[in-house]
């Protein structure tokens, strides 16, 4: 398929999850409706991951596409119908007998994802070493956490040009080259094993607790029991604490088998969140999630959340923007050359600010223009003018004067305050 056809097929999937309730805003949101290019709900401004959208198939397609043309093809299966690679997520079901007064019932726990290891006891240990609120038990807080991290750490628009907004043929080609490069140089999946199992797989090395580098264990005919003991001492590459004997560890092949992590320490070095499904990107001796690895390589548009492959873009408020996406967060009008106000780190045009966000003057009860000086005390504001900032009793101008605030009113003296009591 040529580039022109790829561009024509692009779409953001606006029908996906349409009308789903927002788990954050509750009834304040009318239901999920994807913004044309912002990757957020048009109604409540929250992301799709904050809504009760069933995305398991979509997420499996996304991760499947990520692993396509890599050494991790064993983790995917192609559908016979359309040839789309699907992520073969390992689901683990554990049955635990629960003793009651008379009978013994069976308690079944389903994990929406588990490390793909043959030893189920090892997988169970791995899960138990994660914080309870992050264990992906079906229907739990941990499952919701995993869903959010899949969306946050591995955005589909970081790997698939068809999920991006109006890329040019040149940008499509550059993005495809970028994705191919990170698949071959950085992408990896963690491997859960017992540290002692790695002796035959990697060099006989150890991590010294408190140190950053691993040191070869002493070998030779004169090896004593002390050296033998040292060789079995392993420490976590992240927290530097020792690994307990018999506890599972995570290895990252791109990092080398002399490094290992506690399950709860296998996190992105930027956002410090658990690397979802142990999918990592390795760069400069650090682990990254997909999002923050890409951020370290390319600028990201603060408007559409996509990586910028264009040679021309703008910078404002310490953020990067596609030229066409430096827009008002409320009405989408272009802000280049216009007055705007930052509201919760989002640019808003002057008319929208006055209409939706401006504070109201306690004196005249009109919105205060962002360019006009004002007086603020606690949650109350006034125009800094002789017409508005006045004594609530005698109307004396209080600019530059001492005043007594009382529930949204201001007084020039105790006498005036008493008269209004």
From Swiss-Prot:
<comment type="function">
    <text>Scaffold protein that may play a role in cell adhesion, cell spreading and in the reorganization of the actin cytoskeleton. Plays a role in the regulation of cell proliferation. May act as a tumor suppressor.</text>
</comment>
<feature type="domain" description="PET">
    <location>
        <begin position="92"/>
        <end position="199"/>
    </location>
</feature>
<dbReference type="InterPro" id="IPR034960">
    <property type="entry name" value="LIM3_Testin"/>
</dbReference>
<dbReference type="InterPro" id="IPR033724">
    <property type="entry name" value="PET_testin"/>
</dbReference>
<dbReference type="InterPro" id="IPR010442">
    <property type="entry name" value="PET_domain"/>
</dbReference>
<keyword id="KW-0862">Zinc</keyword>
<comment type="subunit">
    <text>Interacts via LIM domain 1 with ZYX. Interacts (via LIM domain 3) with ENAH and VASP. Interacts with ALKBH4, talin, actin, alpha-actinin, GRIP1 and PXN. Interacts (via LIM domain 2) with ACTL7A (via N-terminus). Heterodimer with ACTL7A; the heterodimer interacts with ENAH to form a heterotrimer.</text>
</comment>
<feature type="region of interest" description="Disordered">
    <location>
        <begin position="133"/>
        <end position="164"/>
    </location>
</feature>
<dbReference type="InterPro" id="IPR001781">
    <property type="entry name" value="Znf_LIM"/>
</dbReference>
<dbReference type="InterPro" id="IPR034958">
    <property type="entry name" value="LIM1_Testin"/>
</dbReference>
<feature type="domain" description="LIM zinc-binding 3">
    <location>
        <begin position="362"/>
        <end position="421"/>
    </location>
</feature>
<keyword id="KW-0479">Metal-binding</keyword>
<dbReference type="GO" id="GO:0005737">
    <property type="term" value="C:cytoplasm"/>
</dbReference>
<dbReference type="GO" id="GO:0005925">
    <property type="term" value="C:focal adhesion"/>
</dbReference>
<feature type="compositionally biased region" description="Basic and acidic residues">
    <location>
        <begin position="155"/>
        <end position="164"/>
    </location>
</feature>
<dbReference type="InterPro" id="IPR034959">
    <property type="entry name" value="LIM2_Testin"/>
</dbReference>
<dbReference type="InterPro" id="IPR047120">
    <property type="entry name" value="Pk/Esn/Tes"/>
</dbReference>
<protein>
    <recommendedName>
        <fullName>Testin</fullName>
    </recommendedName>
</protein>
<dbReference type="Pfam" id="PF00412">
    <property type="entry name" value="LIM"/>
</dbReference>
<dbReference type="GO" id="GO:0008270">
    <property type="term" value="F:zinc ion binding"/>
</dbReference>
<keyword id="KW-0677">Repeat</keyword>
<keyword id="KW-0440">LIM domain</keyword>
<feature type="domain" description="LIM zinc-binding 2">
    <location>
        <begin position="299"/>
        <end position="359"/>
    </location>
</feature>
<keyword id="KW-0963">Cytoplasm</keyword>
<dbReference type="Pfam" id="PF06297">
    <property type="entry name" value="PET"/>
</dbReference>
<dbReference type="GO" id="GO:0008285">
    <property type="term" value="P:negative regulation of cell population proliferation"/>
</dbReference>
<comment type="similarity">
    <text>Belongs to the prickle / espinas / testin family.</text>
</comment>
<feature type="domain" description="LIM zinc-binding 1">
    <location>
        <begin position="234"/>
        <end position="297"/>
    </location>
</feature>
<keyword id="KW-0965">Cell junction</keyword>
């Amino acid at each position: 398929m040529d580039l022109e056809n790829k561009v024509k097929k692009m779409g953001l999937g606006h029908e996906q999850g349409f009308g789903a309730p927002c788990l954050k805003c509750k009834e304040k949101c009318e239901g999920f409706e994807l913004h044309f290019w912002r990757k957020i709900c048009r109604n409540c401004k929250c992301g799709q991951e904050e809504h009760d959208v069933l995305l398991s198939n979509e997420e499996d397609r996304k991760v499947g596409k990520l692993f396509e043309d890599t050494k991790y093809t064993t983790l995917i299966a192609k559908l016979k119908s359309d040839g789309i690679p699907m992520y073969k997520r390992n689901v683990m079901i554990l049955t635990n007998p629960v003793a009651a007064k008379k009978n013994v019932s069976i308690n079944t726990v389903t994990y929406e994802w588990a490390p793909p290891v043959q030893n189920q006891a090892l997988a169970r240990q791995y899960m138990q070493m994660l914080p309870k609120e992050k264990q992906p038990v079906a229907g739990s807080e941990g499952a919701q956490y995993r869903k959010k991290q899949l969306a946050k750490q591995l955005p589909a628009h970081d790997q698939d040009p068809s999920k991006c907004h109006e890329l040019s043929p040149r940008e499509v080609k550059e993005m495809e080259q970028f994705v191919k490069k990170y698949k071959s140089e950085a992408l990896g999946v963690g491997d859960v094993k017992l540290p002692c199992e790695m002796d035959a797989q990697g060099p006989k090395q150890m991590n010294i607790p408190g140190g950053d580098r691993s040191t070869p264990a002493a070998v030779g005919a004169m090896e004593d029991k002390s050296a033998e003991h040292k060789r079995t001492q392993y420490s976590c590459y992240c927290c530097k604490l020792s690994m307990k004997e018999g506890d599972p560890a995570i290895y990252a092949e791109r990092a080398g088998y002399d490094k290992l992590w506690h399950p709860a320490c296998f996190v992105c070095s930027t956002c410090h969140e658990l690397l979802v499904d142990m999918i990592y990107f390795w760069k400069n001796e650090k682990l990254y999630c997909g999002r923050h690895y890409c951020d370290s390589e390319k600028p990201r548009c603060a408007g559409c959340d996509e990586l910028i492959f264009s040679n021309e873009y703008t910078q404002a408020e310490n953020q990067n923007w596609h030229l066409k996406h430096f827009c008002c967060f409320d009405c989408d009008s272009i802000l280049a050359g216009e007055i705007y106000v930052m509201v919760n780190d989002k640019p808003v045009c002057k008319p929208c600010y006055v209409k939706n966000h401006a504070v109201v003057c306690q004196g005249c009860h009109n919105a205060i223009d962002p360019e006009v000086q004002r007086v603020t005390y606690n949650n109350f504001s006034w125009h800094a003018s002789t017409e508005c900032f006045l004594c609530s009793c005698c109307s004396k101008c209080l600019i530059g004067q001492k005043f007594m605030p009382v529930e949204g009113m201001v007084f020039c003296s105790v006498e005036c305050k008493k008269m209004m009591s």
